[in-house]
A protein has these predicted regions:
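Nucleotidyltransferase catalytic core that binds NTPs
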Residues: 1-176
Length: 176
């Protein structure tokens, strides 16, 4: 079975990484797809997000990081032969939105199903929007560190805090 998990991953969070781990266990082949919308503004470039996710997924042999632009996810999923779209659900709002998207996708194709996965309690409040909203406040670094993998944390410090990325990357890789 082939699965796909998509998002903007701007930036990737511990919640994203948890879902990726679940998908890697559930599917024989699992795509992590970065959706790129030319009308949307991002903190991290597509190349930066690809690099971060590739680093985060390096230990999963069956995971491939890809991207797609200006295309419906279900159509992209069809193009890579996916059987399932995996979606993380943190709360009722996520469920309502994702349920609606599942019905829209079902109208476009009946060959791909959506699988909802409930996030564990400790990840319920984690979102890329929350992370970006914290940057710039006093001591944002300590708070953000709780919600993102080390690779992402050091990229954020480099982008928003002016540290030496090569030193930070070496430190992050030593923890792997």
């Amino acid at each position: 079975m082939i699965g796909i998990y998509a998002g903007s991953f701007d930036p990737p969070t511990n919640g994203h990484l948890w879902i990726i781990g679940q998908g890697a266990r559930l599917f024989t082949k699992f795509f992590v797809a970065i959706g790129q919308n030319s009308q949307k503004e991002y903190c991290f470039t597509l190349d930066e997000r690809l690099e971060m996710l590739e680093e985060l997924c390096i230990h999963f042999d069956n995971v491939e990081v890809v991207h797609y632009e200006n295309k419906f996810l279900v159509k992209f999923a069809e193009s890579v032969g996916a059987d399932y779209i995996l979606r993380g659900i943190r709360n009722e709002k996520d469920y309502t939105y994702e349920r609606g998207m599942r019905y829209v996708n079902g109208n476009m194709t009946d060959t791909i199903q959506t699988l909802f996965m409930m996030s564990p309690r400790y990840l319920v409040e984690v979102s890329s929007s929350l992370i970006k909203g914290l940057v710039g406040s006093d001591d944002w670094e300590q708070v953000v560190r709780e919600y993102v993998p080390d690779t992402v944390y050091y990229k954020m410090l480099n982008k928003f805090g002016g540290i030496d990325l090569s030193r930070a990357r070496k430190t992050a890789l030593e923890k792997i």
